[in-house]
């Protein structure tokens, strides 16, 4: 069966990046790594990485979306992945290697897709004021 795996082009720091991601994701598995290329798994998703010369830059056109069950998970991934990188709006961050991540609680999607448009709009308005998503504040906005 065919599979899709992200293939990441790093600018000479692939081994450092893979080691970093392996430390952040508790169930990470290193499949193989040599100085030029690595294969690893994060949360069951296979990734390939290439150690190459500076040529292509990561940008916001693609991001990795982490579904979180709890605020503790949101906090953990937000703090770990943003270390050395930067925070952005609406649950987005950029890690120290330039990759974009969306750290999003499942509850946000549930609230935004509520059939009551007024409740969903209040949740959207609250989210737009946040960098790291705060589930309690979303729930307050939802309740009115």
Named regions from a protein language model:
Residues 4, 60, 87:
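Exposed loop/turn and edge beta-strand positions of beta-sandwich/beta-sheet ligand-binding modules
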Residues 6, 21, 40, 81, ...:
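Terminal peptide-recognition signature
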Residues 1-19, 24-32, 63-64, 107-144:
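N-terminal beta-strand motif that seeds the catalytic metal site of vicinal oxygen chelate
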């Amino acid at each position: 069966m065919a599979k899709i795996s992200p293939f990441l082009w790093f600018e000479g720091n692939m081994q450092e990046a893979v080691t970093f991601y392996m430390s952040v994701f508790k169930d990470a598995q290193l499949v193989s790594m040599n100085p030029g290329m690595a294969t690893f798994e994060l949360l069951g998703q296979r990734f390939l990485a290439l150690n190459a010369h500076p040529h292509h830059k990561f940008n916001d056109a693609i991001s990795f979306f982490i579904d979180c069950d709890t605020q503790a998970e949101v906090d953990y991934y937000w703090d770990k992945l943003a270390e050395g990188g930067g925070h952005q709006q609406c649950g987005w961050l950029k890690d120290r290697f330039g990759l974009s991540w969306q750290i999003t609680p499942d509850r946000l999607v549930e609230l935004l897709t509520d059939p009551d448009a007024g409740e969903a709009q209040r949740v959207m308005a609250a989210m737009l004021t946040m960098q790291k998503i705060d589930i309690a504040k979303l729930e307050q906005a939802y309740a009115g």
